[in-house]
Amino acid sequence: MGYTIDAAESGCYPGTTVLVNKFDLRSQSELDAVEAALVTAKAIQWEETPLCDTFDFAHYRAIHKHLFGELYDWAGQVRTINISKKGTQFCPAEELPRVGEAIFARVRIEHFFCGLSRERFAEELLDLYERTNELHPFREGNGRTQRVFLAQLAQNAGYRLDFSCVDADELMIATIYAAQGIDLPLKDVLDKIIKE
């Protein structure tokens, strides 16, 4: 997890940083293990049979609900608290609905990135990646939701994203740089994962 939040609004079990969950797991390592197994299976399931193809903010939230719904009551719902991580402050909670709708409206205006050259697709994907990362609409599970959404969007546009081509730490570092306005590392990462 690793988010910085107000302890009174944490949604965690008292005296811990473990999120309240449907399995009542109070050990972070146990929750991480269950979460990893469930979310991996759910991501594969979504990839094989997407439950939504509107590519709007409701679609994004539907992916989160699908991935995390067996774990958290709030899956698919935008967070109601402000969060930051590793020095990055994410979109204020009260702005999430408006900003989220605007981000995904742009995807629609750009025709879901269909018919773009690889170079142009990479530029649009970079912008959307940065915007959805800055949005960070959920209490937990933002990166995994983002990757499932972007992979589906890419497939719809005639491309494929292979996140296994990059190390998780490399992606995280590139994302941190992008949040500081330094796009090149994330551009390089996306160049590796976009397949035709």
Could you describe each region identified by the protein language model?
Residues 1-196:
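FIC/Doc superfamily catalytic core
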